[in-house]
Amino acid sequence: MKIAILSRDGTLYSCKRLREAAMRRGHLVEILDPLSCYMNINPAASSIHYKGRRLPHYDAVIPRIGSAITFYGTAALRQFELLGSYPLNESVAITRARDKLRSLQLLARQGIDLPITGIAHSPDDTSDLIKMVGGAPLVVKLVEGTQGIGVVLAETRQAAESVIDAFRGLNAHILVQEYIAEAKGCDIRCLVVGNEVVAAIERCAKAGDFRSNLHRGGVASIATITPRERDIAIKAAQTLGLDVAGVDILRAARGPLVMEVNASPGLEGIEKTTGVDIAGRMIQWIERHATPEFCLKIGG
């Protein structure tokens, strides 16, 4: 097969691993910067061009689209989809997952347990917002934040009001969540491929922090997950329409709670911790689904 990887930086670990895994299985691979793609949208002959040339047909496209380029990155991916390429995560699913409010609404509608969450845009009644999620301590987030950026733990009501007021000055959308103290600064990252959790790690925050993101200095170890955690991770990914997802779960006293679903999970931390060839599993999924029948169904 001919496979395109959409990424701004082909030297990143995840891109290199996906390229290696695909080539090892005999596929042709090209890494394309989605921001350098430009499109001819034409009912007679739509096409995608890249750095002065018209791109050929790709059997499959692997999107590694960062949150900062979601709009144009998913637009480029849609063009590949319209031309019959199989997407490992559809553009609509990526857009859905990147909208934190929309994704939480969909997960809640499906009965998936979440931390108690409130969301507002520059709330005038800060005290009621805090009360709505059960009071302090609580976590205040910028809706547009990633990798632990724009996330603050407010341990008292006064601190929570100060943080919310500060975020209000940014004219930003604010997400307020209950703080799960019993998780002790740890979460479980489940890597879902299709209908299976192929690997799971526990991520714990460094001393003095509560954010478990590996980019923020968190420490990872192999996790043994329960059947319920496995089922919740798979259901969360499927609810958002994702074939590949990183599902972050908090272990609360009342049971596992889904904190976030990542549409473009990094592979480095989880592969190096578990030793699982996740990139290979992703390529195998493509091999099973990027079939001639798929291209005919789409119209490619």
Curated annotation (Swiss-Prot):
It comes from the Bacteria. ATP binds at K141, E178, Y179, D187, R211, S212, N213. Its EC number is 6.3.2.-. One of its GO terms (biological process) is protein modification process. Its cofactor is Mg(2+); Mn(2+). GO terms for molecular function: ATP binding; metal ion binding; ribosomal S6-glutamic acid ligase activity. Signal peptide: none annotated. An L-glutamate ligase that catalyzes the ATP-dependent post-translational addition of glutamate residues to the C-terminus of ribosomal protein bS6 (RpsF). Is also able to catalyze the synthesis of poly-alpha-glutamate in vitro, via ATP hydrolysis from unprotected glutamate as substrate. The number of glutamate residues added to either RpsF or to poly-alpha-glutamate changes with pH. This is Ribosomal protein bS6--L-glutamate ligase. It comes from Salmonella schwarzengrund (strain CVM19633). The lineage of its organism: Bacteria, Pseudomonadati, Pseudomonadota, Gammaproteobacteria, Enterobacterales.
